Amino acid sequence: MIRYGTYMSPFGPITLVSEDEKIVMLDFCKCAEESLVDNNSFVGLFKKLDNYFQGKRTDFDDIPIRLNTNSFRMRVYKEVRKVKWGEVVTYKDIAEAVGTSPRAVGVALSKNPILLLIPCHRVVAENGLGGYSRGVELKRKLLELEGSLIKVPSIK
């Protein structure tokens, strides 16, 4: 069964979609028709999001996700899920781990359907922030919240 939820973060609304109790989408937008929203299905995740946005170290590893994508993106997303709160890695680091180019990693991350749970905001360029599907300013705010902005090359 597909369920929709809306969480109000300090950075704007987040839409969540689950299918058979697994998250298939988490995005910074208000994309769900209000009549379809059933926030009761997301109580556990909402508590984690509350902690996250209060600046508390939060681990989303126990939240089940389902990815409908190709094997290459799956490898990239799996590697990115290893990057924990307060850490940053470069596109090059991820590329070396999965055997591809930094540009290919960037393209894969631009298609990430489950933001925060697959923390692509923690992947940065060797010379700065790099891009983010919902804008570099949001990426900056998320890294600031996690206390890791200082670790970004050329931001120090």
Swiss-Prot record:
Keywords: Cytoplasm, DNA damage, DNA repair, Methyltransferase, Transferase
Active site: 120 (nucleophile)
NCBIfam families attached to this UniProt entry: ogt
Catalytic activity: a 6-O-methyl-2'-deoxyguanosine in DNA + L-cysteinyl-[protein] = S-methyl-L-cysteinyl-[protein] + a 2'-deoxyguanosine in DNA; a 4-O-methyl-thymidine in DNA + L-cysteinyl-[protein] = a thymidine in DNA + S-methyl-L-cysteinyl-[protein]
Keyword DNA repair: yes
Note: This enzyme catalyzes only one turnover and therefore is not strictly catalytic. According to one definition, an enzyme is a biocatalyst that acts repeatedly and over many reaction cycles.
Entries under InterPro entries matching the protein: MethylDNA_cys_MeTrfase_AS (IPR001497), MethylDNA_cys_MeTrfase_DNA-bd (IPR014048), MethylDNA_cys_MeTrfase_DNAb (IPR036217), MethylG_MeTrfase_N (IPR008332), MGMT (IPR023546), MGMT_N_sf (IPR036631), WH-like_DNA-bd_sf (IPR036388)
UniProt function note: Involved in the cellular defense against the biological effects of O6-methylguanine (O6-MeG) and O4-methylthymine (O4-MeT) in DNA. Repairs the methylated nucleobase in DNA by stoichiometrically transferring the methyl group to a cysteine residue in the enzyme. This is a suicide reaction: the enzyme is irreversibly inactivated.
Domain of life: Archaea
Protein name according to UniProt: Methylated-DNA--protein-cysteine methyltransferase
